[in-house]
Amino acid sequence: DALENYIPEFKGQDYGKVTVRQVLTMTSGIAWNEDYEDVNSDVAQMYQAPCQDTEAHILTYMKSLRFAHAPGTHWNYSTGETDLVGILIQKATGKSLAEYLSEKIWKPWGMEHCAYWLADECSNLNIGGSGLSASLRDYARLGTLMLKEGKLGDESIFSEEYIDNAKSLLYEVNDEGGGYGYLWWRNNNGSYAAVGIFGQMLYVDPAKNLVIAQIAAWPKAGSKELTQRRQAFIDAVQRVID
């Protein structure tokens, strides 16, 4: 389905023609700069505009963006599109992300601690691309939920279709065979991960029945050296399991 069917603000705009699947896979084709060190990049500017009534910051910013590629033909990471997924969920369910997460996952899965989710100052909608604050152990429990393919006893919290698309290699994005599924990074060994800036990570390896969660405060949004050290740690854990 096209985004304009769920987000009226996008009617008549390029983003209105983008499908939900294309947003979930970062293949909208919309021009976007995710350079965290460039103060003029899209990711740096997307929350800077003054509020327009109760419209979410990200909608105000992204309404004006235009296609750089035909939808579905080009992969490009965009934090803005993770925000759009959050808005889609809130508009479709009539609930905040925090309420929906609590109802569908946090309480049924027996999370140990309370968590909170930052809200957009203009719309009061939770921000899908960032702002979920939870304990390390509960992040690891989210990974365990993915490892169990969303199953809680005889019930499934996630649909089988979602799990398959989340952990599958839908788009190859590097020469090493790694790629992207539904908002998860897929590695060439079948493992997959949710990776945030400043060192946040949730790593799931079904073949080794392994979940690794990391909360960090790296000095830069992305660090090649620290990423390599983290990968060395993951490799070491896998060797011990073997």
Where are these regions (language model features)?
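Active-site helix/loop module of the DD-peptidase/beta-lactamase fold
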Residues: 1-31, 64, 92-129, 134
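Structural helix-adjacent loops and short alpha-helical linkers that scaffold large soluble proteins
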Residues: 90-102, 150-158, 175
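Active-site Gly/Thr loop motif
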Residues: 112-116, 160-213
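Alpha-helical scaffold elements that line and support the substrate/ligand-binding pocket
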Residues: 2, 23, 61-62, 75-105, ...
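Structural recognition of the beta-strand scaffold that forms the well-ordered cores
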Residues: 22-25, 76, 113-117, 131-133, ...
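Flexible glycine/proline-enriched surface loops and loop-helix/loop-strand junctions
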Residues: 43, 65-71, 81-83, 121-128, ...
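Structured C-terminal helix/loop/strand segments within mature extracytoplasmic catalytic/sensor domains
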Residues: 196-242
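Amphipathic alpha-helical interface segments
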Residues: 41-52, 58
